[in-house]
C-alpha cells in the first residue's frame, strides 16, 4: 500500500506534537531557572504560567502548527471514512468551490468585524468550520449523484456516502447552538452574522437528505426485490407500495424541496443585507459588489417562486386533461412507467392505452420538438389532424402546459363523437409517420418495432429500449466514457441499453487492421464490416439514435452510422459536433 496524504498527516501531526512538547519543557525549565515560576505548578499559578508560555512567538507558532495538523488529520480521516479516494473531477470542483466560498463569504468580513486578535481568531475559526461543512456537503452530493448514475452501486456504498450528510447536519446544528450562545452572551449585532450561513447550510443539507434519502430507499427496495421472488399477487402489492412511495417522493421533493430551497436563499440574502447594514451605505466598491449579490439573490428567489407556481399550474392542467388509470388497468398491465422505470400506484392513461406518471409525462412533453407530441412508448401522435395555427399558436401568457391541456381536452371531447376512437389499435405505420422514411426503400428491408423490444399498446414495460430513463443512462455512460479511456463496442453493449444487432456484434468482433481505425477530425471511427452495409441494420440503428438526438438531421445520422456502424459511437460523435 502506497503512502497517502493521511499517512503524511499522521506523521506531521506527531512531529508537531513532539516539537510543541519539547519546546514547552525547555521553556518551563528556563522559567524555573530564572526563578519566575516555582518547580511545582499548581492550579493557582497555572494561569500565570500559561501567559508566560504564550508570550513567546515560537510557542504560538508551534501551537498553531499543531492545531492545523490536527484539523488536516481530522478532515483527511473523515474523507477516507466517507468517500475513500476522490476522483480528479471531484478534487477540481472541491478546490473551485472552496475558493469561491472564501471569496464570496470571507471577503466582506474585514469591513464589518472589529480588527482585534480575538475577533480575528473567532471569525477565522467560523469561516474554517463553515468551509469544511460546505465542502463535505457538496462532495457528498456530487458522489451521491455519481453513485445514482452508476448501475453497479450498492445500498451500502450509497449509505456510506449518505451518512456524511448526517455528520454535516449534526455538526452544523452544534455550531448553530454555539453561535447562539455567543450572540446571547455578547449581545452585539455583529455576532448575528454567525447564524445566517450555518442555517443556510442546514437547509441545504436537509434538502440533500430528502432527495437522496428517497434514492437510497428506492435502491434498498430494488435490492430486496432482486433477492426475493414472490408470487404474482405479492409482486403486484409490492409494486403498488413502491408506486405509492414514488408518489409521496414526488410530492415531498416538489413542495418541501421548494421550501428548503427558498429558506437557503433567504438565509444568504439575510447574510448580505446584514453585512450591508453593518457597513453602511458609502457608495464604495464593496457596496456595489454587495448590491450585485443581493440583486442576484432576489432574482433567484423570484425566478424560483415563478417556476414553482408555473409547475403547480402545469401539473394541475395536465391532471385535469388526462384520464386516470384505474386500479384494474394497473393490475392487468402489471406495469411500470416507461420513462422513469418505476412502479405506478397512480398513473395517467393516454389514448393509446399506455400508462405513465403525471410528472414523467410532463417532462417528456416538455421535450416535444416543434410541438410534435407523441407517446413515449409507441410514438403515436397525441394530436391528429391539427391545423397549422393549432400546431404553432401564439403563446402570449398561455404556457405550453396549458396549451397541452387544452389540446388534450379538445381531443377528449372529440373522442365521444367517434365510433372507433382517435387512435386505431393496430400497429402504426412508421414508414408514413416519419418523413425520412419516405425514400424509395424496399419495405422488406425494414425491421419492425417489435424486433426492437417496443410494445405497441398495453404494457409500456416492453419499450425498455426507448424512453427517457434509458436516454439518461446513455448520457451518463457517455459522460463516464469521456472522462476515462475509450471503450470498445463490446463494453458499450454490456450496458444493455439497446438490443445488439447481429451486424453490430460482427462489427465488434471484426479485426481492425493497423491504420484502418483511429480518429479523424476528433471523431471515433470503427471499421465497417461487410455485413454492416445492410440497410435494415442502418435504419434500425438510425431509429435508436433519433430517440437520443431527435434534433440532429437524418442525413448526418446516416453518414456517421455508415462510418461507425455503432449506435453508441455515433451518439458520442454527434455530441462532440
Swiss-Prot record:
<keyword id="KW-0812">Transmembrane</keyword>
<keyword id="KW-0863">Zinc-finger</keyword>
<dbReference type="GO" id="GO:0016567">
    <property type="term" value="P:protein ubiquitination"/>
</dbReference>
<feature type="transmembrane region" description="Helical">
    <location>
        <begin position="272"/>
        <end position="292"/>
    </location>
</feature>
<keyword id="KW-0611">Plant defense</keyword>
<feature type="domain" description="CUE">
    <location>
        <begin position="537"/>
        <end position="577"/>
    </location>
</feature>
<keyword id="KW-0479">Metal-binding</keyword>
<dbReference type="GO" id="GO:0043130">
    <property type="term" value="F:ubiquitin binding"/>
</dbReference>
<feature type="transmembrane region" description="Helical">
    <location>
        <begin position="120"/>
        <end position="140"/>
    </location>
</feature>
<dbReference type="InterPro" id="IPR013083">
    <property type="entry name" value="Znf_RING/FYVE/PHD"/>
</dbReference>
<protein>
    <recommendedName>
        <fullName>E3 ubiquitin protein ligase RIN3</fullName>
        <ecNumber>2.3.2.27</ecNumber>
    </recommendedName>
</protein>
<feature type="transmembrane region" description="Helical">
    <location>
        <begin position="58"/>
        <end position="78"/>
    </location>
</feature>
<dbReference type="GO" id="GO:0005886">
    <property type="term" value="C:plasma membrane"/>
</dbReference>
<feature type="transmembrane region" description="Helical">
    <location>
        <begin position="3"/>
        <end position="23"/>
    </location>
</feature>
<keyword id="KW-0862">Zinc</keyword>
<dbReference type="InterPro" id="IPR003892">
    <property type="entry name" value="CUE"/>
</dbReference>
<keyword id="KW-1133">Transmembrane helix</keyword>
<dbReference type="Pfam" id="PF13639">
    <property type="entry name" value="zf-RING_2"/>
</dbReference>
<comment type="function">
    <text>E3 ubiquitin protein ligase that acts as a positive regulator of RPM1- and RPS2-dependent hypersensitive response (HR), in association with RIN2. Probably not required for RPM1 degradation during HR.</text>
</comment>
<dbReference type="GO" id="GO:0008270">
    <property type="term" value="F:zinc ion binding"/>
</dbReference>
<feature type="zinc finger region" description="RING-type; atypical">
    <location>
        <begin position="337"/>
        <end position="379"/>
    </location>
</feature>
<keyword id="KW-0472">Membrane</keyword>
<keyword id="KW-0381">Hypersensitive response</keyword>
<feature type="transmembrane region" description="Helical">
    <location>
        <begin position="191"/>
        <end position="211"/>
    </location>
</feature>
<dbReference type="InterPro" id="IPR001841">
    <property type="entry name" value="Znf_RING"/>
</dbReference>
<feature type="transmembrane region" description="Helical">
    <location>
        <begin position="162"/>
        <end position="182"/>
    </location>
</feature>
<keyword id="KW-0833">Ubl conjugation pathway</keyword>
<dbReference type="InterPro" id="IPR035667">
    <property type="entry name" value="RIN3_plant_CUE"/>
</dbReference>
<comment type="pathway">
    <text>Protein modification; protein ubiquitination.</text>
</comment>
<dbReference type="Pfam" id="PF02845">
    <property type="entry name" value="CUE"/>
</dbReference>
<dbReference type="GO" id="GO:0009626">
    <property type="term" value="P:plant-type hypersensitive response"/>
</dbReference>
<keyword id="KW-0808">Transferase</keyword>
<comment type="subunit">
    <text>Interacts (via C-terminus) with RPM1 (via N-terminus).</text>
</comment>
<dbReference type="GO" id="GO:0016740">
    <property type="term" value="F:transferase activity"/>
</dbReference>
